[in-house]
Amino acid sequence: MKRRALLKLSAVAAAALLSVSNFAFAQAREPIKVGILHSLSGTMAISETSLKDVALMTIDEINKSGGVLGRKLEPVVVDPASNWPLFAEKARGLLTQDKVAVTFGCWTSVSRKSVLPVYEELNGLLFYPVQYEGEEMSKNVFYTGAAPNQQAIPAVEYLMSKEGGGAKRFFLLGTDYVYPRTTNKILRAFLHSKGVKDSDIEEVYTPFGHADYQTIVANIKKFAQGGKTAVVSTINGDSNVPFYKELGNAGLKAKDVPVVAFSVGEEELRGIDTKPLVGHLAAWNYFMSIKNPVDDDFKKKWAAWVKSNNLPGGDKRVTNDPMEATYVGIMMWKQAVEKAGSTDVDKVRKAMYGQQFKAPSGFTLVMNNNHHLSKPVMIGEVRGDGQFNVVWKTPTVIRAKPWSPYIPGNEGKPDQVM
């Protein structure tokens, strides 16, 4: 009897062990859910749709090469529709209902600031792929776009140089929200440090979706009569289309009043006749026109993805800086997960520090413990075909300074996530 009972107990234990083992194996083979949080409608769709598309391309590339830790990635795409409170609602859903391991998303700083408390409360992980104003460092966000010292400051230094036209007066034009206002606060302080007076600086803001730039462009022409002038544009979204069209209509040439943009790239210019805009500038960390083997491969994969998925725009679709930053972010996250052996947010965070990736820009980008990438800086001139000629770039990558030295009170703030 004792022997029979012992055998029965052993069989039950073995079955239980097998059940647990099978459950663990099944769980290990379940796909890893990945959130994609971009506006696919509304004023920001012109810029953000391509970030969703390139994220899906990158996820597909990873899945075809075996996935991450032997598991496929499953994208969960949501559309916050350029509605800032809706971003927070969608982010909460991704974390609590869909149980995503990571989110790639947001463009505007107002959308990022809308979701930030959600990711910090629930200990989620967000990769943010767009240039921004700095003044932020969260353990729950990795910033793969540029900080002001990797875009705004070098661009204005270039405009002031002999090579860049020797500008003495600056018209700061932006969309009315935190990124343009904070960036221009930094730029005004920087210009003061270079001896530029307030009388030689003009600041103008328009709402999201603004479409009538006739009066503003007329005021730019009038302001430019006071001396060599440059326009610094932090306009975001589909308002860039009427602004650049009005520049062309008004005959405002780059040789007279150059415009440097921080949120306009190949995608935003795709639907515009750029011949009247030749010579105007954009500052980024990547341009589609650069040539190197990594970028050639990136563009080839993108063209194939567009064709195989019959994406709107077809062979006219382009690559741009935030797309590259999205691609780099996803690939770095994959490397960090594999290093950590887990998708656990705290483990992945630690594994992200020091991650390197050979980017389409031609540079090896490094993730620092301040959660920002070291990146190159490039300035490009608009061409007649909507692409950019790179006219200036840094020889090496530049470490991001999230806390600008031109903002009072930033002295002594830690340059790492605590």
Residue spans for each PLM region:
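Beta-alpha junction/loop-to-helix N-cap segments that form part of ligand/metal-binding clefts
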Residues: I46-D53, S65-E136, T144, Y205-Q214, ...
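Signal peptide-proximal N-terminal region
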Residues: R29, D53-P75, G165, S193-D198
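Extracytoplasmic "Venus flytrap"
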Residues: I32-V54, V78-P85, W107, D176-R181, ...
